[in-house]
Amino acid sequence: KFTLRFLFTPLVHWPETMITYLEEEEIMFSCDAFGSYGSLDGVLFDDEAKDQLPFYEKEALRYYTNIVAAFSRNTLMAIEKAAAYPFKIIAPSHGLIWREDPMRIVSLYQKWAEYATKPTEPGVTVLFGTMYRNTERAMEACLQTIKSEGVPIEVFNVSTVHPSFMLPSLWTKKGVLIACPTYERAMFPAMVHALDIAEIKSVKNKIAGYFGSYA
């Protein structure tokens, strides 16, 4: 005999999302909550991937910022519901199954969800676009100044990097620097797309700067 409890956790990230709790085995089948990107490459559980955990945790952050971040309030509510039950295993629909240290992924999700309203990490995310390298040269001068202050930086060329790889840095870092030229009297199209995605994913409350050149 097995007993399943269904914990309604709407908008993590679908309206009908539920966590299914198997009482006898203390397993949380958490659906999209606590999931991650990343090919499992022959492993299934966290204890089988110890050497690869930094990769999977990085991919979990990328998954969070792309799939769940816009619903961070709901994520915190889901964590609170799950905490009411003892669990030995977290088994999400995507990514590693956490059986050795299930609280590891729960604590990471808690931290990332709280970034929606609480202070984030020191550092600057730099998004740049360039056509004739004029904006890029100006950006390089800015980067030297920021680096001289010991501030962590991540730099993304919006013309060559998919926005899904920009979002983790945008979500976790306190500062954003945007550098791009104009394009026919408007913002560089690739930058428009990157910023639209950031807005959709609820990236906000940042210290931001902007500069560019015109054509």
Each predicted region: which residue ranges?
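Conserved hydrophobic helix-helix packing surfaces used for dimerization/oligomerization
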Residues: 4, 27, 124-126, 208
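Helix-loop-strand module that forms the ligand-binding subsite of alpha/beta enzymes
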Residues: 161-215
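Metallo-beta-lactamase
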Residues: 3-92, 97-100
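Short gly/ser/thr-rich secondary-structure transition/capping motifs
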Residues: 10, 107, 156-161
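Terminal amphipathic helices with adjacent charged low-complexity linkers/tails
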Residues: 89-123
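Short hydrophobic segments within beta-strands
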Residues: 30, 93, 127-129, 156, ...
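Glycine-rich phosphate/diphosphate-binding loop of Rossmann-like nucleotide-binding domains
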Residues: 135
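Short helix-loop-beta junction
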Residues: 139-154
